[in-house]
Regions:
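Conserved active-site and SAM-binding loop architecture
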Residues: 1-223
Length: 223
């Protein structure tokens, strides 16, 4: 099974993936982050490149594709930023990738992003504050260790307590980045997809997902 993991980061989504004859190609633009990924997953092929362009030129060579394109220009935080005079267009690369895979890709795919400040141009599946575009149904899971991109909760806590919780949740992801340099470790971990969620989605793509193994609160609802 040939898998493409775009915008791979350090591979939070990929951490628990395992199936016979699995070959993962990870694409990450930041060379230092790519080195961490390669160290964590020595059997994966790691490509330092623009994931958006790599996807366009290579999607047809894979059976399963996961994309988590950058989310800042789509996030609801843009309401606050706009009020502060910070104005920016939403990055339409997200929808280019959705249209490409919806129209031409023959395998299974999932594109993940945060819930946007605008009405989505293409109807997604919804989980918490996040949107998913996929050609298969995926279970909605709730884990205490959800953080960063995959966290649908907003704690009403003081800054110190929030920082402590964030540190504890980073540890729960199961990555020890102590020896690595040249990366923003907190940002990298914040951007991680919780490994259990990555596994559940991966198993759903393979039609082997077992809901009894995890806490399940239903299926994604549609807009």
């Amino acid at each position: 099974m040939k898998i493409l993991n775009c915008y791979a980061g350090i591979g939070g989504n990929r951490k628990l993936w395992n199936c016979p004859n699995m070959q993962v190609t990870a694409v990450e633009y930041d060379e230092n982050i790519a080195k961490v990924y390669q160290d964590l997953y020595p059997n994966d092929i790691v490509v330092v490149a623009d994931a958006h362009e790599y996807l366009l030129n290579n999607y047809q060579n894979f059976n399963f594709i996961w994309c988590s394109p950058p989310c800042p220009t789509h996030s609801i935080t843009n309401h606050f930023l706009n009020a502060q005079g910070i104005k920016r267009y939403p990055d339409m690369a997200l929808y280019q990738e959705i249209i490409l895979l919806q129209t031409f890709f023959k395998g299974k795919y999932i594109i993940e992003n945060v819930k946007s400040y605008y009405e989505p141009l293409i109807k997604p599946q919804i989980s918490g504050r996040h949107y998913f575009w996929s050609n298969f149904k995926i279970p909605m899971l709730q884990f205490e260790k959800q953080i960063g991109r995959m966290n649908g909760k907003k704690a009403d806590l003081g800054g110190k307590i929030q920082a402590e919780l964030r540190t504890n949740n980073h540890k729960k992801l199961g990555f020890d980045l102590t020896k690595y340099t040249g990366i923003d470790k907190q940002k990298v971990l914040n951007n991680c997809v919780a490994p259990e969620i990555g596994l559940a989605i991966f198993e759903s793509a393979l039609d082997i997902y077992d809901a009894s193994k995890v806490e399940q609160i239903g299926l994604f609802t549609e807009l």
